[in-house]
A protein has these predicted regions:
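A short, proline-enriched helix->beta-strand linker immediately N-terminal to the Walker B motif
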Residues: 49-53
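Interfacial catalytic loop of ABC nucleotide-binding domains
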Residues: 25-30, 148
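Conserved ABC ATPase "signature" region
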Residues: 5-25, 133-137
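P-loop NTP-binding/switch modules centered on Walker-like glycine-rich loops
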Residues: 56, 60, 64, 68-148
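Conserved ABC ATPase signature
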Residues: 29-34, 38
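Charged, flexible cofactor/metal-binding loops and thiol motifs
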Residues: 118-211
Length: 211
């Protein structure tokens, strides 16, 4: 254990580590007196206090404006390097994934449907899960002509108590075949570093099936 004075000094030190200005003052304040970005930094300091080998960050940038989000992501990257901490990001923000992740697991209906290095996921690679493909084409791009609508994935995620037979994504998949409705695919290796849960993981093959 430590004395109250030692604990106070440790708190101030941790707040300083996450780049909070005037940590001695902030340590005495209540949460409602801090901005959203400051509260997020305090949470990160609390999580790092015990020097974990793994930090789980569940939607760490939700409800933050883009400037504060960039600051928080830079902070987490810096802390990862300084402390040697691995970070497990849980997020729906593809921009955060592209900026922060080394490896990505894409989940749908509680299942991992694809695992790959981030650099593979964000390039026009040979293989992918149709859900991953749908996510990627929904990203706004600077070169998209004015007036062109973004693509979206039809339908909605099924209720956990009423999941479809076969592939869980089949009812929403434009590449769906009869086999997909009857059998559930396994997560299989399509390359040395990529796994996909789909009977038709090769993009060229499944697009040919549409013709």
């Amino acid at each position: 254990g430590m004395s109250k004075e030692e604990a106070r000094k440790k708190v101030v030190e941790m707040l300083a580590d996450v780049k909070i200005p005037n940590p001695e003052v902030v340590a005495k304040q209540y949460p409602h007196q801090l901005s959203g970005g400051m509260r997020q930094r305090v949470m990160i300091a609390m999580a790092l206090a015990c020097k974990p080998k793994l930090l789980i960050a569940d939607e760490p940038t939700t409800a933050l404006d883009v400037t504060i989000q960039a600051q928080i992501l830079k902070l987490m990257n810096d802390l990862k390097r300084e402390h040697g901490t691995s970070i497990l990001f849980i997020t729906h923000d593809l921009g955060v994934i592209a900026q922060m992740a080394d490896d990505v697991a894409v989940m749908y209906c509680g299942q991992v449907v694809e695992m790959a290095p981030a650099k593979t996921l964000f390039t026009d690679c040979e293989f992918s899960h149709p859900y991953t493909e749908g996510l990627m084409v929904s990203i706004p791009r600077l070169d998209t002509p004015a007036g062109v609508r973004l693509e979206s994935i039809p339908g909605s995620v099924p209720h956990p108590l009423n999941l479809p037979k076969g592939c869980k994504f089949a009812p929403r998949c434009k590449y769906c075949q009869q086999r997909c409705l009857e059998e559930e695919p396994e997560l299989v290796n399509v390359t040395e570093e990529q796994q996909v849960r789909c009977f038709y993981p090769r993009k060229e093959e499944r697009r040919a099936n549409l013709k």
